[in-house]
């Protein structure tokens, strides 16, 4: 796949709509040409201890952050006409659909691909198929796992190799 947008969300709690950060990496003709990162004020606006342990974000980090519709207005022009790619599509696509629903936004039925699913098929001998493991197998060292932009970059790298 030569043209796509890799996307990753982190959530504040167990509600898929509680996106608190997003990373997007734009790939055209097989090259990374743009990226976007933003903190987001989550909805519902509370942080679960375990989620904060994963990504390190707390309510203090996002209390001045924009709400999702404002962030998405910045992302929409970047991803226009591109399929979306995530590592574990059910999670990230689920987040996107849930937050669209919460804000009563019309979901445009994005074309979505899953590097996790494909990696299990094309790299069956890996110890596991976690993002950092697959990224490393594809020649990319993920330095800041669970930072949305770092994870989106790793996903983009994987997608360029296996999709």
What is each stretch, according to the model?
Residues 1-109, 124-146:
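Conserved non-catalytic scaffold segment of RNase H-like nuclease domains
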Residues 11-13, 117, 154:
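Short, glycine/acidic-enriched loop or turn micro-motifs at the edges of active sites
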Residues 106-119:
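Conserved beta-strand -> loop -> alpha-helix junction used to position metal-binding or nucleic-acid-contacting
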Residues 117-120, 136, 157-160:
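Generic alpha-helical structural context detector
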Residues 147-160:
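Acidic, divalent-metal-coordinating active-site segment for phosphoryl/phosphodiester hydrolysis
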